[in-house]
Design a protein with these regions (language model features):
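Contiguous, structured surface segment used for ligand recognition
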Residues: 1-96
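Short, Φ-rich (hydrophobic/aromatic) sequence segments
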Residues: 12-15, 70-72, 78, 349-360, ...
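C-terminal functional modules
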Residues: 43, 364-564
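Catalytic-core regions of glycoside hydrolase
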Residues: 76-79, 104-105, 194, 200-204, ...
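Short boundary motifs at domain starts and secondary-structure transition points
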Residues: 89-95, 263-266, 601
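Aromatic-lined carbohydrate-binding surfaces of glycoside hydrolases
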Residues: 102-274
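Disordered, acidic Ser/Thr/Pro-rich linker "stalks" and the adjacent N-terminal cap
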Residues: 532, 544-633, 643-646, 650-651
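Acidic, glycine/polar-enriched metal-coordinating patches/loops
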Residues: 635-638
Length: 653
C-alpha cells in the first residue's frame, strides 16, 4: 500500500524492527478485499501472522492504527531485544461506529494535560470519539457561546484537535446555546458563525446540546429548525465534516411525557444523531429502552451513558466495573459515549470497560474486564488497586436512586458476622475472613502510591488516606467485638476507645478534604464496609453504656426531607454546622402546583432563616422568610411540630 498512515506506521516501528534487510520478516499492508458489512466499518482490519510474513488488510487508516495497537499488545520482547509474536489470524471490527466519552459533567473541568492524556488513552483503547462539552466552559455555553475563544483557549483547542487526529479520535466540539438563545435569524447565524470559528481551529465534528434547560430554548420544533439549518448550511457544505450530533432536552425516558421526541423524529434531518441517557438520567442501558426511544426519534439513538460520572455524589469515587450494558443492543445505537468523573485518570478503570463493550459486546465480560483494567491502569500494584477499586464503587444514596454493587467479594462474610453479632455471638470464621480483608485494605494505599502515575495518585489521595483508616478501623472493630464477648470490660473499653479514635480520624478527613459546595467529604466502602464498622462500634458502645434504649431526641441525629416531589425524595441533604439544605440538582427541577418541599431536624436546633434559590424559575419566585413577612396574604409556612423534632413544609403554588 502506498502512503500508509504515518501514525500507525510509527506504532508498528516502535513494536517491530522494520528494515530493508531481505532476511527480515516481511510486512504487507493492503486494502481489505473481504467487503462483508462488518469489515466495511471504519476501524476494521484483518491481521495474519505466519512464520513467513505479517499481513495487515484494512478498511481505512483507522483500521491500520488499530491493527498496530493489537500488534503492540501481542508483541513480547526478551532481554536481548528480540521481539516475538504469536502466530494466528485476527479478524477485528467494532460493534458500534462511534465509541468514546463526552466531557459533560458538572464540577471542575479536566485540565488541558488531562485531555491530552485521555486522547492518547482512547487511541490505545480503540475509542474514536471525544465530545468536548464542559459545563463550566463559558464559550461552549452561556454567556459567551456567541463569541470566539480567547487566544490561549483557542490554541489549546488546536492542540486537542491535533492530538485527537494522531490517535484517530474525532474531536467533537459541542455548543450549548439553550439557556439564552433567541429563535431569531441573528442567533441562528451566531451558531453558524461559531461553528465556522471552530472549523478554522481545525474542528471537523460538531454537536449541539439542549440538555438541562427549560423555557423558550426547550422547544422541539425550534431546535429542529436550527439543527436542520446547520445540517444544510454547514455540515453538508464544509469539507470533511462528520455527522451532526444533538443532545435533546428530554434526553431520558422519565422526562419524555410530551410529544417532544416525536416532533424531533418527524422533523429532524435523518442524518443527525440524537443522544439518549436511558430510562432516566442515570440508568443502565437496555435493549428495550433503546427500542422504545428509537421508535420515537425514528433512528438509532446515540447513547450518552452517565457512568462513571460522579457530579451527583462528589464525596465518592466510582471505580467499579462497567456493567448494566445490554450485550444485544449494538444494532439499536448509533454511538456510545460515557460521561466520566472529573478525575480523569481514575475514570480510566470504567472507560477501559466501556471501550471493550462498544467494540465487541458479545465477548464483553464486566468482571474479568475490570481485573484487566486495574492491571492496565496501575501495573505496579494491580491487586492492591483492585482492592481499592472494588470497595469504591457505589455512589451512596442519591436523588437518581442509582446504586452499584460494592465489596461483593466480602458482603456475605460481613453479613454473616453481623448476623451473629446482633445475637450477641462472635462468628470466628467470618471474623477471620473480614480481618484478612481489612489487613489488605490497610496495606493497599501504600502499595498503590508506588505507582509512577502521579496524576492518578493526586486525584485519589484523600480516598487513599481514608481507605487506610477504614482498614485499621475494620481490624479494630473485629477486635472490639471479640473483647466485648468476654468479661474484661477494661479491655473492651480500651478497644472501643481506640476504634472511636479511628472513626474520629475518618470524620476529620471527611470534613477536611474535598470540601466542594455540594457533596462534601471523602467516603469509602460506604455500602458494606463502613456500615459494618459503624454497627459494631454502635453495638459495643450501647452494651458498655447499658443504653440500648436511647432518648428519642438523641436518635434523631440527622435532618431529613419532607416532600412529594419525586426528583427531591431521594436527594441527599447538605448538612453543616449551622445550616441544612437540599443539594443542588444538576437537572431542571419540575414542581407541579400543589406540590411541597420541606425539612425536619432536631428539636434542639432552631431555624433563624430560610433561603430559596430558584434561579431558572419561569415565574421568578425566589423567596426568603422575609418575603412571607412582607406579603402576609401569601400562605404561611406549615408547621408540623412533633415532640421530638421540628419541621417546616412549603407548599408551591
Amino acid at each position: 500500500m502506498q502512503h500508509p498512515d504515518e501514525d500507525a506506521m510509527r506504532l508498528i516501528r516502535q513494536t517491530l524492527s522494520i528494515t530493508d534487510n531481505s532476511e527480515a520478516l516481511p510486512l504487507k499492508i493492503t486494502s481489505l478485499e473481504d467487503r462483508t458489512p462488518e469489515l466495511k466499518r471504519s476501524g476494521a482490519y484483518l491481521l495474519v501472522i505466519t512464520p513467513e510474513e505479517i499481513d495487515i488488510a484494512i478498511s481505512d487508516s483507522r483500521g491500520l492504527f488499530y491493527a498496530a495497537q493489537t500488534l503492540q499488545q501481542l508483541a513480547q520482547t526478551d532481554g536481548q531485544g528480540n521481539t516475538t509474536l504469536p502466530l494466528g489470524v485476527i479478524k477485528d471490527y467494532p460493534d458500534v461506529a462511534y465509541r468514546g466519552t463526552v466531557e459533560g459533567f458538572y464540577g471542575d473541568p479536566w485540565s488541558h494535560t488531562d485531555r491530552i492524556e485521555q486522547l492518547r488513552f482512547y487511541g490505545k483503547m480503540k475509542m474514536n470519539t471525544y465530545i468536548y462539552g464542559p459545563k463550566d466552559d463559558p464559550y461552549h455555553s452561556s454567556p459567551n457561546w456567541r463569541k470566539p475563544y480567547p487566544e490561549k483557549e483557542a490554541a489549546q483547542i488546536k492542540d486537542l484537535v491535533k492530538e485527537a487526529a494522531a490517535n484517530k479520535v474525532d474531536f467533537v466540539w459541542a455548543i450549548h446555546p439553550g439557556l439564552d438563545i433567541k429563535w431569531t435569524d441573528e442567533d441562528r447565524m451566531n451558531v453558524l458563525n461559531k461553528f465556522g470559528m471552530m472549523y478554522d481551529l481545525g474542528v471537523r465534528s460538531f454537536a449541539v446540546f439542549f440538555d438541562d434547560i427549560s423555557g423558550e430554548g426547550a422547544k422541539a420544533d425550534k431546535q429542529a429548525d436550527l439543527l436542520n439549518f446547520l445540517q444544510k448550511e454547514f455540515i453538508e457544505k464544509k469539507e470533511g465534516v462528520s455527522p451532526l450530533i444533538m443532545c435533546p432536552t428530554e434526553y431520558n425516558r422519565a422526562w419524555a411525557g410530551s410529544d417532544y421526541l416525536d416532533v424531533l423524529g418527524r422533523t429532524l434531518d435523518p442524518a443527525i444523531h440524537v443522544m439518549w441517557t436511558g430510562n432516566s438520567v442515570i440508568h443502565d442501558i437496555t435493549l428495550e429502552g433503546q427500542e422504545w426511544v428509537n421508535k420515537r426519534i425514528q433512528r438509532p439513538s446515540y447513547v450518552w451513558w452517565n457512568f462513571p460520572v460522579s457530579d451527583y455524589c462528589r464525596d465518592h469515587l466510582l471505580m467499579g466495573p462497567s456493567y448494566g450494558l445490554d450485550p444485544n443492543a449494538a444494532h439499536a445505537m448509533s454511538g456510545f459515549v460515557a460521561n466520566p468523573m472529573e478525575r480523569a485518570e481514575a475514570s480510566k478503570v470504567a472507560l477501559y470497560g466501556v471501550a471493550d463493550y462498544a467494540w465487541n459486546m458479545k465477548a464483553y465480560n464486566p468482571e474479568s474486564d475490570f481485573v484487566e483494567a486495574c492491571r492496565y491502569v496501575l501495573p505496579e500494584a494491580p491487586e492492591a488497586f483492585r482492592t481499592f477499586c472494588e470497595n469504591n464503587c457505589d455512589p451512596g444514596p442519591n436523588g437518581h436512586r442509582y446504586r452499584r454493587d460494592e465489596s461483593i467479594r466480602y458482603a456475605e462474610s460481613a453479613e454473616a458476622f453481623l448476623h451473629d453479632f446482633r445475637q450477641h455471638n462472635y462468628n470466628a470464621d467470618a471474623a477471620d475472613r473480614m480481618n484478612r480483608l481489612f489487613a489488605e485494605i490497610t496495606a493497599a494505599p501504600a502499595a498503590i502510591e508506588t505507582s509512577r502515575n502521579k496524576a492518578l495518585i493526586d486525584e485519589i489521595k484523600p480516598w487513599l488516606m481514608q481507605f487506610h483508616l477504614l482498614g485499621k478501623a475494620g481490624q479494630k472493630a473485629i477486635r472490639t467485638a471479640e473483647t466485648g464477648q468476654g468479661e474484661d470490660r477494661a479491655a473492651t473499653w480500651q478497644s472501643y476507645l481506640s476504634l472511636t479514635s479511628l472513626l474520629d480520624s475518618m470524620r476529620t478527613i471527611d470534613q477536611t478534604y474535598n470540601q466542594n459546595p455540594y457533596q462534601k467529604g471523602v467516603k469509602v466502602g460506604s455500602r458494606v464496609l463502613t456500615p459494618f464498622v459503624q454497627e459494631i462500634h454502635s453495638g459495643v458502645g450501647s452494651n458498655l453504656l447499658f443504653a440500648d434504649q436511647t432518648d428519642a431526641a438523641t436518635q434523631m441525629s440527622k435532618a431529613s426531607i419532607l416532600t412529594d416531589i419525586e426528583q427531591l425524595k431521594y436527594q441527599p441533604l447538605k448538612e453543616g454546622k449551622d445550616q441544612i439544605g437540599y443539594n443542588r440538582l444538576n437537572e431542571v427541577l419540575r414542581i407541579e402546583p400543589g406540590q411541597s418541599f420541606g425539612l425536619t431536624w432536631e428539636l434542639q436546633k432552631e431555624a433563624t432563616s430560610f433561603n430559596f434559590s430558584l434561579p431558572k424559575s419561569e415565574n421568578r419566585r425566589r423567596q426568603t422568610m422575609d418575603d412571607y413577612r412582607r406579603h402576609p396574604r401569601r400562605p404561611s409556612p406549615l408547621q408540623i411540630g412533633k415532640a421530638r423534632s421540628q419541621s417546616t413544609l412549603y407548599p408551591y403554588a
